Amino acid sequence: MSFSEFYQRSINEPEQFWAEQARRIDWQTPFTQTLDHSNPPFARWFCEGRTNLCHNAIDRWLEKQPEALALIAVSSETEEERTFTFRQLHDEVNAVASMLRSLGVQRGDRVLVYMPMIAEAHITLLACARIGAIHSVVFGGFASHSVAARIDDAKPVLIVSADAGARGGKIIPYKKLLDDAISQAQHQPRHVLLVDRGLAKMARVSGRDVDFASLRHQHIGARVPVAWLESNETSCILYTSGTTGKPKGVQRDVGGYAVALATSMDTIFGGKAGGVFFCASDIGWVVGHSYIVYAPLLAGMATIVYEGLPTWPDCGVWWKIVEKYQVSRMFSAPTAIRVLKKFPTAEIRKHDLSSLEVLYLAGEPLDEPTASWVSNTLDVPVSDNYWQTESGWPIMAIARGLDDRPTRLGSPGVPMYGYNVQLLNEVTGEPCGVNEKGMLVVEGPLPPGCIQTIWGDDDRFVETYWSLFSRPVYATFDWGIRDADGYHFILGRTDDVINVAGHRLGTREIEESISSHPGVAEVAVVGVKDALKGQVAVAFVIPKESDSLEDRDVAHSQEKAIMALVDSQIGNFGRPAHVWFVSQLPKTRSGKMLRRTIQAICEGRDPGDLTTIDDPASLDQIRQAMEE
């Protein structure tokens, strides 16, 4: 079957299509109804079927490949490496599941996980899935008030954390941040389970705090039966990044999530049992939830949990892992690759990367220069894909297991099965034609694996995502265009649009032009208020060579060259009013550019919540660059 036929069946016959895909996982009780869409926009998949994510990730592989690698935990910060076979991982997950039950955790209870990227974090999530507890991971290093807001929203009976993590040689004091958060929160967990890594001193609260290692010792060898959950019970809550006010918890189911991930591993990522999948993300983000914690194990692959930066202690650290563990598929973000662009390619190429078959990139738009550079450097195809926290798995990609169409630089590909993607005119709501820019939306029902609702707030779910147009369609809040061959191109968020004297430009368009300059390593473009034009674009550039930072004449020359390049590629209406050179740009710890923060600084406004920022010194660079 061609991909086109596969896709059309998913849109025209969704119930039959997804019933067939559901055979990819084990069901303890068969479902009686594939889809219940009687209360749109809410969709219920595989109704009355009973299954379990942990069983499908671990237990069902025990007979086929018990001694195959399942989990590889690597920390470039502590220089530790730990490996677990499926049998060993099964033992560890059972022990932790027994620990959770001893602390009073029951089916449907929330367990908040605030941990570094260590094996215990992954094992804890699988243990929650095993007993039917709902896990909610808060990205490590979030400031206390952000953690407190999530505690109050999720109301966990237990929090699992650690003394500290590390990033680029810097210690991140998880326990201290957590204690501050709990003191600010109205809801109080019954217990806090703590992994002591010996990285930082931590005060313990008597009667509340429990040592992970000591409790584990009491539960070694325990066997905890799987809780068979109805498909639409909640598996996890994941809070979207960058929210203000009340946190927005994306609620996901059990059966739909398992089926969607299992299908994607075969059709999109080409994962095969016995292989090794390296997703260089964090379990606190959706990519890590889906393609570190669950999807590789569902496919019988080993999954790598990595603590550290792509450049620490050197720029070869990822590639050493690829070589050592014979990684066949790797998943990262464009930002990480742009960082690596600043280093000599010889440092990467000196490693044996012959096992690596493809590199997947997602999380933000992938510019063509970065895609070309990494593909040539690694000598592997690069496959972009586009999705969101809410979708849980790719909305657009090239389904490499089904589709032989080539990748097209700058495009994440075509809509994936189950996603009836449309581009709509923002004013009229009418469908856009070829090469016409519109908002990317998805016709309901959303396919399995996507957001069920916002935790505890159905009204907000409908109002936020389904009320933008006159008819109910799911709004992604991303601009896109579609070419004559059906490839889509993401132009940035709908709030990342610059209106310069009536010309509407996506920041992505200008950034892509500037990125094509040979002296540019990375760039961020924002729109700032202008008395004459309404808005003008300004660019902050990380140069490949430091002379643009040290010599004003060189910087001025480079600025003129970049402006001329934008003139030639977009037109002078897209030319930045200023190009400033910096050595780093403000980003979250997950690598996302903080464009709104940059914009606020440029306009002299309060930059607001900075809890997700990786290095606050980058903000000083923005301010200093503008003053010079």
What function would you assign to each model-found segment?
Residues 298-301, 328-332, 341-407, 420, ...:
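Gly/Ser/Thr-rich phosphate-binding loop
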Residues 190, 194-196, 535, 568-593, ...:
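AMP-binding/adenylate-forming catalytic domain of the ANL superfamily
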Residues 258-276, 286-329, 342-345:
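Conserved AMP-binding/adenylation subdomain of ANL enzymes
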Residues 138-164, 178, 323, 330, ...:
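AMP-binding/adenylate-forming catalytic core of the ANL superfamily
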Residues 126, 130-214, 326, 333-334:
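Structural core segment of the AMP-binding/adenylate-forming
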Residues 67-69, 192-194, 204-239, 246, ...:
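Conserved pre-ATP/AMP-binding loop-to-beta segment of ANL
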Residues 379, 448-477, 494-495, 507, ...:
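Conserved ANL (AMP-binding/adenylate-forming) active-site segment centered on the GW(Y/F)…HTG consensus within
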Residues 414-418, 430-465, 505-507, 606:
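Conserved ATP/PPi-binding loop(s) of AMP-dependent carboxylate-activating enzymes
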